[in-house]
Structure formats: structure tokens, C-alpha cells
Amino acid sequence: MQRKAITSVLFLLSLIAGVLPLQAQKDNRFEVSKNLEIFNALVKEVEMFYVDSIDIEKAVRRGIHAMLSGLDPYTEYIPEENMGDLQLITTGEYGGMGALIRQRGTSGEGVVIAEPYEGMPAALAGLKAGDLILSVDTTNTSGKTSDEVSRLLKGIPNTKMTLVIQRPGEKKTRKIDIVRKQIIITTVPYYGVYGDSTGYIYLSNFTDKSAQEIKEAFEDLRQNKHIESLVIDLRGNGGGVLESAVQIVGMFVPKGSEVISTKGKIRQWDRIYRTSIEPLDTVMPLAVLINGNSASASEIVAGGLQDLDRAVLIGSRSFGKGLVQAPRELPYDGKLKVTMSKYYIPSGRCIQQLDYTHRKADGSVAAIPDSLTSVFYTANGRQVRDGGGIRPDFEAEEPDLPAMLYYLTNDNILFDFATDWAQKHITIPPAEDFTLSDDDFEALKAFAKEKNFTYDRQSTKVLNQLKDVARFEGYLAEDSTLFSALETKLTPDTEHDFDRFKPEIKKILAVEIIKRYYYQRGEMIENLKSDIILEKALQVLADKELYIQTLRAPEPQP
């Protein structure tokens, strides 16, 4: 009798368990239908009765943005006119002239060429960094944003456009005819050899061509440069196409290795991604460089190679994006890029740092504290943790840049000086040999003074806030001597600060100048001349015992 009762209870529980989800789905569908009906009626009523005319498209898009931004930063609506941006992210291709443009200033100063790409139509037509775009064909660009100008410049390959530009230092404008081409942006802008025999490959982002580009770079380094170890640099790489990350891991681990699994609301769409290609090399010592801007697909590569004990990681903790997005078709040729799942790397951990499902009362998102993370184990039994990104095996922090550099960059002092400098120097030595002279640095100081460059330290702003607090509490007069001394100490001395931060300023200026001659490749060469993270990687790879010991299973505790 008791067994029969238990069986009956279990049957009822199973029945309830089956009914509750169905009821929940039914209730949820009703809520969706009800709120769509309300929204539809609301838009009609506002459009009909609001006292002024309304741009319905803008109003609805603001509503869409508000709804999606409350979910996470990665779920977004992509209207038809922005589909080219999605294509660029996934393929690295677009129809245009091949140049980076940017807004100059914040007061409608126009849009300028920031960086032509090597070998692309813009560079071949003679466009240079600093050129102000006045018009594209018959459209005046005055007052337009960089996004608006970008849409004018992009188009169907092999179509012609005419640009009118103003070159700094010239009174007359220039008219330049350009034929748009299919622009393919490489994701491996630079690779080379460092130390005695260590290959270096920089990957800027992940498109559907990245794996092939990595393969070609690696094979060139191995066959023609005879490298014995390899560094893959993922610093600043915000991710991209997931499948490319899996393919890159597959080049260095045995075929059939699990790289990630994805889990979402729709269980039928859960997937396990395994390597499907024959590896290029499974034994060569390998280091991966990461930092706080290494995210998503970068973390799949770094985390996968760490969990499989195939590479040592060097740098600082990665961003912590453990979410996967996929596009969904929408009416009128739009798309919804929606977060559909979380991903888990080989040890079983999810490295998502921010918990978007549990927001604070003010709507902000909290990071998962280290105390709440869990321990997982690599293939060799090394301890790793979930949440909060990927932690490197060797911590090495990039030096902080002085605030003065931010203002020199934001006020276009370095950019404009480099433009002026390049107009006076037709050629420069190879990027590997280029150095900025002290005379050039003094010329920069004079240039900044001529432009009336000044800046405010953050410490000065904080001091003013502290004075306000002291005034409120009635202690300002009593502490006036102390505040005066601090104010004197913290008042920016531009001349002094130029000399104090001379090495850092010269470094950034050298990069800005070299780009004018050797493009992104030259920029990379200059940046790597004194890179402490790369130097640490070279040290670890050169110490074979340290490298092996780092990846080895821990000794069992007695």
C-alpha cells in the first residue's frame, strides 16, 4: 500500500513537472502577445494625437535599443542599412576605398583620414592621414558624423567616386577620383621572429579568414625562418567568429579535441565543438599573450590552449566574455544579433565575468567576485577557475600611460604634429631602425605651445571636490594653508610634464609618424621594440624547464 502511494505521488509530481513548463510557456506567450498589442496601439495613438509630428522610425528604434540594452551589451538590432558592418565583422570584407576615418574634435571640425590601409585604393590614390574630407561625389560632408561619411564612402566594388579634400598646409583643395574595390582586411597584420628562434604572430580579430591567415604565417615562420617556439598575441583582440577560434586551437592540439561546448535556452541547439583538422604542430613550445581587452573568441583560443595544457598564457586577466551571439532574420532585411548561449572551455568552466541576469537596483551589473568562483582542472590536473576571465600563467602588467598623453591625443596635438612632420620628410629609415630625435621632441613641445595646449590633471579635479567637502563641513578656512600647498603642487606644469614623460610621449609620437610610411606593420614593429609582455614570453620559452614545469601536473600532496 505504501509503495502504491509513493508511486502515485511520483506520478503526480511527474505530471505536475510536465504541466508547469507548458503552463509557463502559455503564460509567457500571452504576455508577449499582450505587450505587443499595447505597444502597437501606443505607437498608433502617439502618432495620431501627439501635438507635434513624430519620426516614428527613430522613436521605435529608441524603444528597441532601450529594450535590448537592458539585456546585455551584445544583443542588438541591425537594420538593413547597417548590414555592411555585420559583414565586415564576420568576413573582414567591404566595398570601399580602404582607409580608417575619424571625427576631428567635437565641434563639427569635420571628418579626416586617420589611416589609409597599405595597398588599398585610398593609399594608391595618394590620400594621406590628416586629409579633411569636404565632399563625396555631390554630397557635402560638413556637419556629418564619421559613420555618415563612412556610408558615403562604401559601395559596390568597381564603382567610381570623387572626393574633395583639404590637405593641411595647402590653400587649394584637391579633387581625387577613386574606384571602390572589395577591401579585405587582414587579421594578421604582422608576424616576425624575435629572440634567437621564436616566431611571433599578432591576430587583431577573428573573421572567417583568420585561421587560414594564422596557418600561412605559421608555415612561413616554420619553413623559412626555422622557428623553434611561437608567440600568438591576442592582446586587444575583442573576438569575432567562434568557428575560427576552434580552427586555430585545432592547429596545435590533436584532431578530435573538444575546444568548447555551448549551452542555451533551446537545448536542441546546444553544441560541442571539436577540432576537425590535422594539427600543424602539437609539440612546439607555445605562448599566448592576453590582456583585459582580449575577449570572446580570444578567450576561447587562450582558455582552450590553457585547459589542454598546450600553451602558457602571459599578460593580465582577460575580459571575461563567456556569451555567444547568433544572427536571427527580421522583416525588411534587418537582423537581430542575440545572445543565445554561454560557452564552456575544455575544463568545463565558463569565464563570463559580468552577471547580466542579476542586476543591482540601479540597473548596474556586478562582476562575479573571485570568492564565488569554482575550481576546475586542466588536462594535466592544474587548477584553473571559472568566472572573471582567463587568468594567465605568468602575470605581467603593461605600464600605465600618463594622463597627459590622453590629452595630447584627444586634442590632436600628436596627430597634427605627425602630419606636419611627414610633409617635411619624404622618406624615413626602415621601421626597425627609426628613432625620434631629441630635436624632434623639442619641436613637438614648441608645436604644442603654439597650439596653446593645456590640460587638467584628475588630481586637481579631485582636490577641488575635496575643497567643496571641506567648505561644507566648515574646515576650509582652517585648512587653507594645506589646500594652497596642494593646489600649487598639483597645478599642471606643461613644460615640466613634457620632460617628465618624455620617453612615453616619444614612443607614441614615433608610432604615429611610422604609420604614415609603413602603415599597420610599421606600427606593430615600433610597439614591440620595448614590450615587456613579449619579453616575458621570450624568457619563459627560452627556459625549457620552466615551460615544462608550468604545464606539468602538480605533485601529489602527502
Regions found by a protein language model. Name each.
Residues 50-111, 158-180, 184-190, 528-538, ...:
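Extended, small/polar residue-biased N-terminal targeting/export presequences
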Residues 130-132:
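Structural motif
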Residues 297, 309, 316, 320-380, ...:
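Polar, glycine-rich mid-to-C-terminal structural blocks
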Residues 350-357, 361-558:
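Conserved functional hotspot residues or short segments at active or partner-binding sites
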Residues 1-9:
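Bacterial N-terminal signal peptides that target proteins for export
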Residues 22-35, 39-56, 88, 112-116, ...:
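Cleft-lining beta-strand/loop regions that shape enzyme active-site pockets
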Residues 9-18:
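Bacterial N-terminal signal peptides
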